[in-house]
């Protein structure tokens, strides 16, 4: 039996960004790769290296057909505002859980492995596929356990 698509409409995928930590600006990178970006806002807010490597590519090299980062949430609302402006994200939500029902999948682009299970848990429990960018546990012998996806998730 072939599993069904992970999202309702694979030709129109809505992604959410769930989090940012001070150690990395990957929410800017991921969002810019998917949505394109505002070079002025990006250079004002993201780490200089991000503007440098994004600027090395042509504007028409950004974007993924049928995919868009539509929502962002960050622990610090000011971070969410800056990422949204730099990466052309339409909607800022107040809580990570507010992404549920609004997006088809979430990106968790943080590198604090010890936080990943807690950050991913509400999405897994709701059947929203998370992409956790870094390993789930860098300070343990193995990853922190996540609950199994709900019955019927991804069908």
Where do the language-model regions lie?
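Beta-strand-loop-alpha-helix segment that lines the small-molecule cofactor/substrate pocket
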Residues: 104-111, 117-155
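N-terminal glycine-/serine-/threonine-rich beta1-alpha1-beta2 phosphate-ribose binding loop
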Residues: 2-125
């Amino acid at each position: 039996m072939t599993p069904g698509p992970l999202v309702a409409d694979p030709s129109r995928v809505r992604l959410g960004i769930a989090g940012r930590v001070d150690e990395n600006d990957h929410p800017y990178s991921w969002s810019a790769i998917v949505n394109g970006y505002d070079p002025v806002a990006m250079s004002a807010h993201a780490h200089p290296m991000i503007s440098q490597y994004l600027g090395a590519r042509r504007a028409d090299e950004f974007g993924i057909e049928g995919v868009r980062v539509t929502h962002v949430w960050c622990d610090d609302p000011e971070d969410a505002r800056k990422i949204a402006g730099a990466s052309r994200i339409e909607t800022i939500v107040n809580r990570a859980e507010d992404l549920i029902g609004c997006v088809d999948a979430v990106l968790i682009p943080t590198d604090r492995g010890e936080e990943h299970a807690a950050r991913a848990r509400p999405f897994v429990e709701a059947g929203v596929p998370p992409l956790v960018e870094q390993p789930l546990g860098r300070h343990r012998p193995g990853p922190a356990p996540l609950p199994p996806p709900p019955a019927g998730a991804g069908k």
